[in-house]
C-alpha cells in the first residue's frame, strides 16, 4: 500500500483566549492557505487515494476536506476514525488500514502521533521524523502484521509549496 500521512495545517493557538477545547481547535486562515498549497502539490504529484481517513478533531477534518476538494474527491469518502486521535496507539492505524486493504490511502492527523506511527512501522523505539504542520510523508507499506514499511519521502510545507509552483 502506498500510504500518505499528512499533519493538519496550522490551527488556532492554545494560548489564544478564544481557543476552543482541544478537539474543536480549527485551522487559521494561514492554516487553510498552507493546507491548500500542500494539497495542490499532492494533486500535481498525481496521488489518487482510494481511502481517506482522518482524526475526528476539527483541524484534521478540515485538512482532509481541503485535500478532497483540491484532488476532486467527494468529501463523503473522508472517514473519521479514533485510530488517528492523538492519544491512540500507532498500531490502531495499521489495524484500520489492514482492514481496508486498498492500494493507496491518505491519513490526516497530528504530531507526534503520525511520527510515532512512522517509528512503529520501522520498529524504532522513538520517532525519527518530524512532520511539520501541513507536511506530508509517503510510505510504502509491505505488510501489516507485523507492520513493515519504507519511507519514500517526507516533505515540509515549504518544499511542497516550491514543488507546487
Regions found by a protein language model. Name each.
Residues 97-106, 148-157:
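A polyampholytic, Gly/Pro-enriched intrinsically disordered region
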Residues 162-165:
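Acidic, His/Gly-rich catalytic cores of divalent-metal-dependent hydrolytic chemistry
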Residues 2-6, 104-109:
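Beta-strand elements within well-structured catalytic alpha/beta cores of enzymes
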Residues 99-104, 111-135:
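Non-DNA-binding regulatory cores of transcription-related proteins
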Residues 2-84, 88-91, 114, 127-134:
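Active-site-proximal alpha-helix that buttresses catalytic centers in soluble enzyme cores
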Residues 41, 66, 70, 99, ...:
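Active-site catalytic microenvironments for nucleophilic, acid-base chemistry
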Residues 124-150, 156-160:
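Domain-level recognition of soluble alpha/beta enzyme cores
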Amino acid at each position: 500500500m502506498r500510504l500518505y500521512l499528512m499533519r493538519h495545517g496550522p490551527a488556532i493557538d492554545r494560548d489564544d483566549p478564544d481557543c476552543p477545547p482541544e478537539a474543536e481547535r480549527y485551522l487559521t486562515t494561514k492554516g487553510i492557505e498552507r493546507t491548500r498549497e500542500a494539497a495542490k502539490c499532492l494533486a500535481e504529484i498525481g496521488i489518487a487515494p482510494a481511502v481517506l481517513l482522518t482524526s475526528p478533531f476539527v483541524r484534521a477534518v478540515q485538512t482532509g476536506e481541503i485535500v478532497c476538494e483540491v484532488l476532486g474527491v467527494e468529501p463523503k469518502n473522508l472517514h473519521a476514525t479514533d485510530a488517528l486521535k492523538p492519544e491512540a496507539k500507532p498500531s490502531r492505524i495499521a489495524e484500520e488500514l489492514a482492514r481496508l486493504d486498498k492500494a493507496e490511502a491518505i491519513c490526516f492527523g497530528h504530531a507526534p502521533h503520525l511520527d510515532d506511527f512512522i517509528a512503529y512501522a520501522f520498529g524504532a523505539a522513538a520517532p525519527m521524523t518530524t512532520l511539520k504542520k501541513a507536511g506530508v510523508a509517503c510510505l510504502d507499506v509491505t505488510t501489516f502484521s507485523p507492520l513493515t514499511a519504507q519511507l519514500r519521502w517526507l516533505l515540509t510545507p515549504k518544499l511542497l509549496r516550491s514543488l507546487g509552483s
